[in-house]
């Protein structure tokens, strides 16, 4: 067995040097998420965003990589750690959505160039995606009327920032 902590196995450096270890854990995470459907909380947030009057701009900032907020229909979504079901090539621009990893080989190759695929998720020791951080920065600069912090330990500064900002307003 690989005999390393999960935080190391799911890190950028290990993915680059020993992708089979990282993919082993990614497959386990995907299996745990497989078949999951949005719950009532996901549905309420998505519906609130769609039906609020006057029209509200409800933003969801999630650390989850399960894609459930998107599946529920949330319109304004910042998936700060990515989505496990979006795969991208490590060499070219090829991307695809894969909802079930069971058909993937242990080290899935790109259909375009044959290089290794990876999910569009933030591994440990990797930078957050620029598009997500820019979207969050834009919302932080606009401020908030109301912030709900649901289901998070708020261990990362970028997760607690909206709460702190709303408290200061």
Set out the residue ranges of the language-model regions:
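Conserved catalytic core of sirtuin-type NAD+-dependent deacylases
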Residues: 1-169
């Amino acid at each position: 067995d690989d005999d390393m902590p999960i935080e190391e196995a799911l890190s950028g450096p290990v993915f680059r040097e020993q992708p089979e270890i990282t993919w082993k854990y990614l497959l386990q995470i995907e299996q745990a998420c497989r078949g999951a459907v949005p719950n009532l909380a996901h549905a309420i947030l998505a519906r609130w965003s769609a039906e609020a009057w006057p029209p509200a701009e409800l933003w969801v900032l999630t650390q989850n990589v399960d894609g459930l907020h998107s599946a529920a229909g949330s319109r304004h979504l910042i998936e700060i750690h990515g989505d496990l079901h979006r795969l991208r090539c490590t060499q070219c621009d090829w991307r695809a959505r894969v909802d079930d990893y069971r058909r993937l080989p242990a080290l899935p190759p790109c259909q375009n160039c044959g290089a290794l695929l990876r999910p569009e998720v933030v591994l440990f020791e990797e930078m957050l995606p620029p598009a997500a951080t820019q979207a969050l920065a834009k919302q932080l600069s606009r401020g908030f009327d109301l912030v709900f912090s649901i289901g998070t330990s708020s261990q990362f500064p970028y997760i607690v920032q909206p709460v702190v900002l709303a408290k200061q307003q």
